[in-house]
Amino acid sequence: MDIANIACVWEQRKLGEVANMHARIGWQNLRTSEFLDSGEYMLITGTDFQDGKIDYSKVHYVEKERYEQDKKIQISNGSILITKDGTIGKVAYVENLPMKSTLNAGVFNLTVVDDINTSSLYLYHYLKGPFLLRFVNEESTGGTIKHLNQNVLVKFPIPLPIYREQLKVSSFLTNIDKLITLHQRN
């Protein structure tokens, strides 16, 4: 079997079938005056994404009540974040989270529904590929400022190999990312 046909034999699922996704809803929006320079609860925004990760040195913080306001946007290691406003479709994988964290508006928090059958790292790698951006550009709404709607994102098709294969694919792609980062430093 050649490489071009591999994904054809994998199960095809919709993103909404394999992941839960949540974002800060309108009435919960934070005012800039609520952004703190230090604290116990980090606030992650799309501008904190750097090369598929969160740059924790640039984040703001919020009060405990704003963190506790919505458990569905409290992020954890293994969460996948996708920007939905402005520069849409940027993807970050959460790891090495140093403290409790929540999201600002403009970012989806994705968590896999079944972590026995779906690898969050595999899903992250697939989402950061060109397929999501292509899909987003075809499906996004708005004029000069685009917006990615959740009802569109849930329809995004995901080729899903068996879990063991997902681990192999994500390990391979993670190693490539590490090599790219290493070469960019030199």
Which ranges hold each PLM region?
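Structural detector for helix-capping/boundary residues
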Residues: 13-18, 47, 105, 130, ...
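Proline-centric
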Residues: 4-9, 109-119, 133-134, 151-167
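Amphipathic alpha-helical coiled-coil/heptad-repeat segments
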Residues: 1-14, 160-186
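Non-catalytic DNA-recognition/assembly elements of restriction-modification systems
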Residues: 3-26, 155
